[in-house]
Amino acid sequence: MNYCDKIHYNIYTTGLATFGEMVDALLAQLPQDEQILRLAFFGMPNDNEQYVSRRIMLREKIRKFYGNHEPVLSYVSQPPLNAGLILEVHSYKADEDDHITFRRHGGFPYVVLENADGRFLFAGGLHGDVINFGIQQQSAEVFHMMGEVMRREGFPVNCIIRQWNYIEQITRFDGPDQHYQMFNNARADFYGKTDWSNGYPAATGIGANLGGILVDLDAAVFARSECYATPIDNKLQIAAHAYSDQVLEAAQQKKATPKFERAKSMTFDDRRIVYISGTAESLVGVGLGRQLHITMENIGQLIGKAKLKMLRVYLKEKSFYEEARELLEGYNLNIPISYMWADVCRDELLIEIEGIAIE
């Protein structure tokens, strides 16, 4: 069976209850006949102390639930707009050709999948000390841990296919330094140690109301010439890594551009999976409907004939939810869609959408 048929993405939701009850309700919905690779919870803690205590509770529940087969675990502080708590699940229907190993490094669980197509790394939930350190120090700490995991498993940094970056108060400044710019500088330092001749990863850089810096990633080293990664550009948009300095805000006068592609695909023989980066359209003075329409046009350009399997929608204002949901229903996608309240990386952006498509 092709990798594209074995990898699955789904979204589960639950109504408002206590945090523990919501987690239990979500875990009860998970598929029993698949290997769970990644669990990403999206919720709304009251402050960073509660965020940390809930993250610890989550980890304890997941360890008890999965034992030695602990998937990657992330807790993202983004208020869900269509649920009390949202769970995004990446799972895999393994066959006799697949070898899956569950490991931990520094307390962080990660998963390695090996088969005839190559080796695949699923890692994440990587975070620093949210309570005691600032964004710059947390960013450096997260990339250091990422490097350690990748070195340990023999994955070069330039084989990252998809990266999710959650940045507390992304457009806020600490003195002259913007949080997003501090993160971009740390990412550029980490990425600068290698050559990216096959393009940067697909990525999302999105605001979180709490939680400091949190990073998830997928990486791949291919074993057959018929399996490979391809960076995808959109002729309608400027490549993010080619932004001018004026787009970003100085962090100690060092302005590294965001290092990501608009999308990246993995091809397996005649099939492919497309990871769509966080996509938005920088239109000043237009409403949500126009931004959403152009964003979906951009996504259509990126995926070609591939079919969307899942979307995440980030909205700048809670009040946009009903309009966004109705507009997307008009596309008749019939796929899982999650809606979160989150700051997008530039003030004029009202909506950002990311997703996964398969052809």
Regions found by a protein language model. Give the residues of each.
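N-terminal presequence-like segments and the immediate start of the first folded domain
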Residues: M1-W164, Q169-Q301, K305-E359
